[in-house]
Amino acid sequence: MQKLINSVQNYAWGSKTALTDLYGIANPNNLPMAELWMGAHPKSSSKIEDASGQVRSLRNVIDADKATLLGDKVASRFGELPFLFKVLCADQPLSIQVHPNKKASEMGFAKENAAGIPLDAAERNYKDPNHKPELVFALTPFLAMNAFREFSEIISLLQPVAGANNAIAHFLENPNAAGLSQLFASLLNMQGEEKSHALAVLKAALDSQHGEPWDTIRLISEFYPDDSGLFSPLLLNVVKLNPGEAMFLFAETPHAYLQGVALEVMANSDNVLRAGLTPKYIDIPELVANVKFEAKPADHLLTQPVKQGAELDFPIPVDDFAFSLHDLSPAETAIAQESAAILFCVEGEATLHKGGERLVLKPGESAFVAANESPVSVSGTGRLARVFNKL
């Protein structure tokens, strides 16, 4: 049971103020602070201070005794802490992304290795053989896009821009999965005059269209005025999460985070296929091969939590991680799991007890609890978020 020393990722889209305003994390160099990472990811592992005062990488500590710290089931199934926990602070839209499923990730990783493509190459799609399921939990109002709209909605929204590109007219005549696939690829493939014309038609439509998703297109255009991803809000659900709402992001489903602060939990993977709103490499054939061109109604996208006493559990369809929130009270309650856990103080103050040990977490602080330390007692005020495994 040890407090974590976590790193901040200074990606350009991050907020310069959110982590300071919410959690008092200093920003002396006035850099964008996009993500606070909690976990043992090789790119940027959290650290802990041991009894002798020595600071050590959490990844190295776990590697030295996986079965004890992770639990036998997690150690044998994953061989590492299988999740990464983040506070994500988006001031600007992130790229539209698709994550391949587990089988496609394994095959793509092996294929690119066999082709001799370096892991750090710009054209590399698969950085590891794992899938990347994600859950996002809003701390502030959080704007995102997730999954294709109902086809009837797409048809209606495309009417004002029907003249932007032949693929739009074709989809309106053939509104099915094959037509959507062709439209998606055609918009990404646009170059030169074709792209200029399409974006001009879209921007002209903004003069007469109001509300959503046109407001989201206006927002994105402030940052990406010449990106064909500006058409995406017409195809994808625009989702506004209120604080306390959560959403699971499935494999093979386009999504993008646009603005706001959220907790994000994901499997340990860097496999991302980009699909717009980015200057980075887009492998369009690989992307289209890894997208399910099926509609998901917007009202089905939120993850409905299950309340069990003071715990709010968010059920998800994978075992790479589990996520729950705990309302704290002065009376101690036990938190137990057969895996390691990362506990994060969302608000208030949390006190953790185990044997003679006592650890206090203030907002924005987190702790690592090893599997062999379960259960721990918690008390305090406010809320505690827990990421762990149910195996």
Report each predicted region and the residues it spans.
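Short, conserved beta-strand element in jelly-roll/cupin
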Residues: 38-40, 87-91, 98, 133-141, ...
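Transition-metal
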Residues: 1-209, 279-297, 323
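Conserved short histidine dyad/triad with adjacent acidic residue
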Residues: 307-310, 319-337
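A short beta-strand-loop-beta hairpin characteristic of the jelly-roll/cupin
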Residues: 48-49, 58-74, 147-148, 226-242, ...
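C-terminal, non-catalytic macromolecule-binding modules
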Residues: 261-313
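Short acidic-glycine-tyrosine-enriched beta hairpin
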Residues: 88, 236-249, 253-258, 263, ...
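A short hydrophobic beta-strand segment most commonly corresponding to one strand
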Residues: 94, 135-144, 260-279, 321, ...
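Generic C-terminus detector
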Residues: 92, 349-391
